[in-house]
Regions:
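Mid-chain, structured segments of secreted extracytoplasmic proteins
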Residues: 56-80
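Amphipathic, heptad-repeat alpha-helical segments
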Residues: 19-48
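Hydrophobic alpha-helical segments, especially transmembrane helices
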Residues: 1-3, 34, 76
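Classic N-terminal secretory signal peptides
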Residues: 1-18
Length: 80
């Protein structure tokens, strides 16, 4: 019985977690665009552009976990 209850809770929480990932992905893409607009160091530009390209592609595909991985890569480049 507990397993059924746990499974039902996880299934019900799924869409909410996906919505959080989707909004975090969109916020991350905005953060990367803003960072590029502020003229970052020359060495960071290609890495940020790559992270932005990957994040945007994964957002379109609905792969928000992979989008968040690209955003995390951009944060590392920026030292955040």
């Amino acid at each position: 019985m507990r397993i059924l209850l746990l499974s039902a809770c996880l299934l019900a929480a799924g869409p909410a977690l996906a919505a959080d990932d989707a909004s975090s992905c969109a916020e991350g893409i905005t953060m990367i665009r803003d960072a590029l607009a502020l003229n970052p160091p020359e060495a960071a530009v290609p890495k940020l552009k790559n992270a932005l390209r990957v994040a945007e592609r994964e957002q379109k595909e609905g792969e928000f976990d992979e989008c968040l991985d690209a955003v995390a890569d951009a944060r590392k480049v920026l030292g955040r």
